[in-house]
């Protein structure tokens, strides 16, 4: 999985960037999404607030903003078109590879790690996996969706080795 990482805060260590990369690759493998691409940007609460207002019309900072990329391509190609035109097939493959982007608030991650009594590393892993599941179509609007998403989230974090301790 290709993941573009951007630290707008200047506060994210190389180790934390590496952990985020690794846990997202681990989650991608679990979901069979190894061939996908995404972006992760680490932001401040101020920037998170701006993004939350812009994209979700919510006037406060949040821990992670997940923007799922759903291409709205109206052009239909049949298999023969793609076989006859390798460039078109490659373009369509690249177009389909990008699944979305996450904005993780470093400030919120620190606050929540302290509030929940676990490590900053655990909170960052939680936010990365939570956002990753969102951009892969998981949600928690209903009790059933919440049970499925949170169960999978905990399964990934535990298998990776990021427990609540």
From Swiss-Prot:
State which Enzyme Commission number(s) the record gives: 3.1.-.-
- Top EC group: hydrolase
Q: From the Swiss-Prot or TrEMBL record, state where the protein is found.
A: Cytoplasm
Q: How is the cofactor bound?
A: Binds 1 zinc ion.
Could you tell me which Pfam families the record lists for this protein?
YbeY (PF02130)
UniProt key word rRNA processing: yes
Which GO MF terms does the UniProt record name?
metalloendopeptidase activity; RNA endonuclease activity; zinc ion binding
The GO biological-process annotations, alphabetized, read as: rRNA processing
Domain of life here? Bacteria
Q: Which InterPro entries match?
A: MetalPrtase_cat_dom_sf_prd, YbeY, YbeY_CS
Q: What are the binding positions for Zn(2+) in this chain?
A: 130, 134, 140
Endoplasmic reticulum is among the record's keywords? no
Q: Which cofactor does it need?
A: Zn(2+)
* Cellular component GO terms, alphabetical: cytoplasm
What UniProt keywords apply to this chain's record, in alphabetical order?
Cytoplasm, Endonuclease, Hydrolase, Metal-binding, Nuclease, Ribosome biogenesis, rRNA processing, Zinc
Q: Which family does it belong to?
A: Belongs to the endoribonuclease YbeY family.
Q: What does this protein do?
A: Single strand-specific metallo-endoribonuclease involved in late-stage 70S ribosome quality control and in maturation of the 3' terminus of the 16S rRNA.
Protein name, per record: Endoribonuclease YbeY
- Species: Streptococcus pneumoniae serotype 19F (strain G54)
| Gene name linked to the record | ybeY
């Amino acid at each position: 999985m290709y993941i573009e990482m951007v630290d707008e805060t200047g506060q994210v260590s190389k180790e934390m960037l590496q952990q985020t990369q690794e846990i997202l690759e681990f989650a991608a493998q679990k979901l069979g999404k190894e061939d996908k691409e995404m972006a992760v940007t680490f932001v401040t609460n101020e920037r998170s607030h701006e993004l939350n207002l812009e994209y979700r019309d919510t006037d406060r900072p949040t821990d992670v903003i997940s923007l799922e990329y759903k291409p709205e391509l109206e052009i239909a190609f049949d298999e023969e078109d793609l076989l006859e035109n390798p460039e078109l097939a490659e373009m369509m493959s690249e177009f389909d590879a990008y699944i979305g982007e996450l904005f993780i608030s470093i400030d919120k991650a620190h606050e929540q790690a302290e509030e929940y009594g676990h490590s900053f590393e655990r909170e960052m892993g939680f936010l990365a996996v939570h956002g990753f599941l969102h951009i892969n179509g998981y949600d928690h609007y209903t009790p059933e969706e919440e049970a499925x998403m949170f169960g999978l989230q905990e399964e990934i974090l535990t298998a990776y080795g990021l427990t609540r301790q």
